[in-house]
């Protein structure tokens, strides 16, 4: 067995009238799944991720921020749902201004989680958040065959409701007529039932190990019921530096009864490969800080009605601004002298606007300059997403 501990904090509060989770359970599920994908034991080896049951593609908005992921497949059987939400995967304006350091291809696919299809080959990680409880037994039986037999990913994450927790929910509201939390649920498993399902998978596919966890902690004095949502993490043994029991099949056959997936939408994100040396990167940052200091100096001159041909920027000030990129006093002074700038009395001499030299516009030397601050508000405005699915 292996373990995984979440760093997401949460608070569960139960009163006489109800129970609340902060943050909401759906956000806790997303946070937990992102942390699983970013686990240092396998993060760098997860390049292609497939999410089954992607629905409104809310989880994608978080997953796309993982720079090591280069291919995301979003799969759902509901074509109309995919069509209504397909534009949500398109790059934002900020993605063009501050592009990724690696490529990202996104495909929206209509298909059944039980069907094997060419688009699923070479998948490194599979995500199925609150999916399995929505399928009938015949589909449920085929899911392990498709994922662990055909896809053979390095990492698989399933989440599903924990029926043990329903004893708390029913203190305040009855379950739905079907006996579950949601009208489309076909079943809700206890922790033992979920564990038995997982044990059956690793017995049939011994190349995998699993760990059980969950989100949505129970209130105090009810710890015995477990979390609202239970999570199974399956990891292929070679990701844990263990020997595989069986060799991987190089190109598994597609089930003849499977219906091929239909590609609904595809998009490729802009990316920028920075080929500059560390020295060139630091020089660009130095130029940006010199330009910023000069503009501030000239603005103060205009306000005071005084004009000078030069201004002096303290090396200490420059160092303070650039320590976060690994700058040292020696490296800064070396760069300044190499680029014919004058250093006197622990200051660099900056010429006025009418005497500008070629270093005056650092942006023409770099397409990827420091623009983070200017983008924060824009990204927040573009990436707001509303309340998610039920807990």
UniProtKB/Swiss-Prot annotation:
- Is-annotated flag, keyword Metal-binding? yes
- Any note on cofactor binding? Binds 1 Mg(2+) ion per subunit.
Residue numbers binding Mg(2+): 130, 133-134, 185
Which top EC class applies here? transferase
Keyword hit for Translocase = no
Keywords assigned by UniProt, alphabetized: Magnesium, Metal-binding, Methyltransferase, RNA-binding, RNA-mediated gene silencing, S-adenosyl-L-methionine, Transferase
> Which E.C. number(s) belong to this protein?
2.1.1.386
For this protein, what is any one GO molecular function term?
Answer: small RNA 2'-O-methyltransferase activity
GO terms under biological process: piRNA processing; primary piRNA processing; RNA methylation; secondary piRNA processing; siRNA processing; transposable element silencing
What this protein catalyses is: small RNA 3'-end nucleotide + S-adenosyl-L-methionine = small RNA 3'-end 2'-O-methylnucleotide + S-adenosyl-L-homocysteine + H(+)
Region annotation (Disordered) maps to: 354-391
One GO CC term on file:
cytoplasm
Q: Which Gene3D superfamilies match?
A: Vaccinia Virus protein VP39
Required cofactors, per record?
Mg(2+)
User: Binding residues for S-adenosyl-L-methionine, per the UniProt record?
Assistant: 76
Q: Quote the biased-composition stretches of kind Acidic residues, using this chain's numbering.
A: 374-384
Give the family per the record: Belongs to the methyltransferase superfamily. HEN1 family.
Q: What does this protein do?
A: Methyltransferase that adds a 2'-O-methyl group at the 3'-end of selected small RNAs. Mediates 2'-O-methylation of piRNAs, single-stranded siRNAs and long hairpin RNA genes (hpRNAs). Methylation protects the 3'-end of small RNAs from tailing and trimming and could constitute a recognition signal for appropriate argonaute machineries.
Q: What is this protein called?
A: Small RNA 2'-O-methyltransferase
**Which gene name belongs to this protein?**
Hen1
